Amino acid sequence: GDFFIHRNIANIIPPYKSSKTDHSTFAAIEYAVKVLKVPNFIVLGHTSCGGIKTGYSHYLKKPNKNYKFINSWLANLGAAYKNVPKTLSVKNQINFLEEENVRVSVYNLLEFPIVKKMVKNKKLSIYGLIYNISSGDIKSLKI
């Protein structure tokens, strides 16, 4: 089969009505769904994600003033960050955030009217996965 791949920092799909939009990500979604008519859409995060680690730090302390565009982009992690149990160790909080970001991104993807319609009509399936960099294992997340 064929693949159409779009990547960005921390593998974020922002909310459909976000003020911090990334038109590249939105255009890629629209192209994949409307033009290519992909039957499967995979939101794939990975362990040891530098973007997630930077985003985690972004919420623990004040954002770095030198990161204008990075700060704006990583602000999209807010919904996932709010769900991180603060009782976990820092390492486990970051691991949780890696997975939660995939879940939230899947929910955000379902806000796109065309995506919602295609899923409802069983013309599109969406999967949330985490790739473990160390082991090579792929974990399917419950969404």
Stretches found by the model and what they are:
Residues 11-39, 50-143:
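Divalent-metal-activated hydrolytic enzyme cores
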Residues 1-12:
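Catalytic core of membrane glycerolipid acyltransferases/transacylases, capturing the structured
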Residues 43:
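Conserved functional hotspot residues or short segments at active or partner-binding sites
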